[in-house]
Every structure is written in C-alpha cells, then in structure tokens.
C-alpha cells in the first residue's frame, strides 16, 4: 500500500513533466533525451545484482558479515559502472554520435557515485519492514526530480531537463536512507564469502539487465530505425500509456519478493498478490485506454492528438505486465532465478523482434504488436506461477474434501 501511494504521488508529479516537455520541447529533443535515458537505464540495471536481496534473506547470525561483504561489492560494482558509462559516452562520441546524447549519458553516470553509500541501509530497512518509509523516500526523490524538470523546462527548454534532476536529487536519497536505518558496520565482523553472492547474483543480474532491455530496447530500436522525432513521439506515448503500469510493476516487485520469502504459505500469498494487483490495475488501465482520445490532446496539446490511439493500445499492455511481475517475484522467492532469466529473455526477444519487424509500418503497428506479444509471451511465462497459485491449491482442496 505504501509503495502504491508513493507511485501515485510520483505519477501525479510526472504528469506535470509530460505536460511541460510536450509544450516546451520538440519531439526531436524529447527523442534525444529518451535515447540517453534508455541507455542509462539499461546500464543502471546492472546495479540490481542480488546483493541487497542476500542481506534481506540472511540469517541473523550472518547479518553483519553479509553486510560487510555487500558494502565492498556495492562500492566496487558502482564505481565500475561509473567508469563503464563514461567509456560508453566517450565511445559514442568517438564514432560520431550526438554530442548532446554523450553529455546526457555522462550526467546520468554521476548517480553511481552516490548509490553505494546507501544501498546496504536500504536493504536493512527492507529487512526491518520499513517499507512505508522507503516508499516515502523513493517517492519524495522522484517528486522533487519532477518538480525540478518542470522548472528547468520553463527557463531552459532543452533535452537535459529530463536528465539533470536525477543527479541533483541523488544526495537527497542518500541522506534520507542513511538516516532511516543507520549502519556503520562492525569492524570485528568477519565478512562472509563472496561465492554465495555470485552464485545467486549472476542470474538476478541477468534478469534485471534483460528486464531493462524489455523496457528500453524497443525505444533504442525506434530511434535507430525511425529517427529521434519518432522516438520522441513513442517516448511520450509510453509515458502517457504504460508509465503508470511500469511504476506499479516496479513497486509490486519491490514489496512482493520479501513478502513471499517471509510467507509460510507462499502459494496463498502469491494468489493474493496476483488477485489484488490485477484487481487494482486492470480497471484503471481500461478506463485510461478509453479516455485517451480526450485526455491526450487536453494535457499534451492538439499537436499530440495523433498519439491518442497509440496511448490507448499501450495502456492495455499493463495487464500482462503486472501478471508477469508477480510470477517473476515468485520464481525468485522459490530460488529459481535461472528460470526467471530464461522466461524474461524470451519475452524481451519477442518484443524486440516485434519492434524491428513492425517499425516500417509506424508507431500504431508497433503498439498493437507490443500488446499482442505481451499478452501471449508474458502469460505463457507466468504459467508455472499461475499453476502454483491457483491449480495446485484447487487440487489440494479437492483432495482434502
């Protein structure tokens, strides 16, 4: 509930950003920012390496040692990602890429310098059940970032208004999480072995990278195949259509995994999670899809009215997305990250192939393909979880009757 309220607040503030950039920036400028954001988000997925989840799942007597090892891994990993992103920007510039995109990628890299000093505290806070406070911090950071984006768009209408606030709000996040759950580490604690982190983390890391590709690779393909203007239109359609569902899915994955880990009846908890999440999101996105022809030109302006059909289609893709998010959390809680990785990779490849094949037909064709592929691929990938949550429980009740 806390994460849901947080996402509602962030989406409300994000709406003002969408309205501002639609009126202040050209589709090409938005497309340039979208390309940088897509590249940055794919690289940022590498921070989701399962280290924090090892802290959440650690036994009490191993906690200090686990945190000590985790802190070292976080620093090593984030500094490495900073270097990689700087190298990507330099390489992109060297091969003749847009100077503005290079600068935007460099700005996004600055986030990695703040993250490692607070990631252990975040995991410990989640372990302690401080979900409401974590949600408030995450939501507060995004709201402040969105307010800054609107202010910058008014005084400095350029692509960087969608990027710079991420870096400017990173210190707020760091100070807040360190204050929420202070932890300095015990110098006498014996660090746990790194191998368990690697054994668990490789699959989780692969999952998160593939998940980021599922969310962002189509945007890069649209930019490469159709140009920055088409990417700007596609990016705005996604923000107006699937943005709500994407945020809800992120919040759901954050809270459902620890809930399933702690549950004595995992099947019942999964069944409750699927039923509740679909019950909440499905009516909202259906209404959103129906109203898109009215609210898109009203909010974004008449110049963007052509996007209303694409927005309506993409709204409906939220339903299979939320179903798959619940199933993926169950697989991870069951210790099946490799199965989740395989399923996520297949879904991602299907969506990328859809974009590549339908790009010549335009954005509406891509959107219809995205919806169809999402419904089929994500439902098939979620079948093991659906079986555990519903069919197995039904069989057990019939046997006991």
Q: Where are the regions a protein language model picked out?
A:
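Membrane-interface junctions at transmembrane-helix termini in multi-pass inner-membrane proteins
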Residues: 54-63, 113-138, 262, 316-346
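Helix-loop junctions and terminal segments of transmembrane helices
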Residues: 44-63, 126-127, 237, 241-265, ...
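Membrane-water interface segments that mark the loop-to-transmembrane alpha-helix transition
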Residues: 1-14, 36, 45-90, 103, ...
């Amino acid at each position: 509930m806390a994460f849901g309220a947080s996402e509602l607040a962030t989406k409300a503030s994000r709406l003002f950003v969408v309205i501002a950039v639609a009126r202040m920036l050209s589709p090409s400028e938005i497309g340039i920012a979208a390309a940088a954001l897509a590249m940055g988000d794919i690289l940022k997925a590498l921070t989701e390496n399962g280290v924090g989840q090892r802290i959440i799942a650690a036994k009490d007597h191993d906690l200090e040692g686990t945190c000590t090892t985790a802190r070292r891994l976080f620093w090593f990993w984030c500094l490495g990602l900073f270097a990689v992103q700087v190298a990507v920007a330099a390489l992109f510039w060297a091969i003749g890429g847009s100077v503005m995109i290079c600068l935007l990628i460099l700005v996004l890299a600055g986030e990695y310098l703040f993250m490692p000093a607070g990631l252990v505290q975040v995991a410990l806070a989640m372990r302690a059940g401080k979900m409401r406070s974590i949600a408030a911090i995450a939501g507060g950071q995004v709201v402040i970032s969105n307010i800054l984006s609107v202010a910058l768009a008014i005084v400095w209408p350029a692509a960087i208004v969608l990027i710079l606030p991420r870096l400017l709000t990173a210190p707020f996040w760091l100070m807040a999480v360190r204050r929420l759950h202070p932890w300095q580490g015990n110098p006498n604690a014996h660090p746990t072995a790194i191998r368990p982190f690697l054994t668990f983390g490789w699959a989780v890391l692969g999952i998160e990278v593939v998940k980021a590709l599922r969310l962002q690779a189509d945007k890069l393909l649209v930019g490469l195949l159709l140009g920055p203007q088409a990417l700007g239109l596609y990016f705005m359609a996604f923000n107006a259509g699937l943005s709500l569902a994407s945020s809800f899915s992120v919040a759901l994955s954050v809270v459902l995994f620890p809930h399933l880990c702690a549950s004595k009846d995992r099947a019942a908890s999964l069944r409750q999670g699927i039923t509740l999440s679909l019950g909440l999101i499905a009516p909202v996105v259906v209404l959103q899809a129906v109203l898109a022809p009215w609210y898109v030109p009203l909010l974004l302006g008449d110049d963007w009215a052509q996007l209303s059909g694409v927005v309506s289609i993409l709204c409906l893709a939220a339903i299979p997305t939320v179903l798959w998010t619940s199933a993926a959390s169950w697989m991870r809680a069951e210790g099946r990250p490799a199965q989740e990785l395989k399923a996520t990779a297949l879904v991602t490849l299907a969506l990328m192939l859809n974009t590549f094949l339908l790009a010549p037909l335009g954005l509406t064709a891509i959107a219809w393909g995205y919806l169809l592929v999402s419904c089929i691929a994500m439902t098939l990938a979620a079948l093991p979880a659906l079986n555990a949550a519903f069919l197995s429980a039904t069989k057990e009740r019939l046997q006991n009757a």
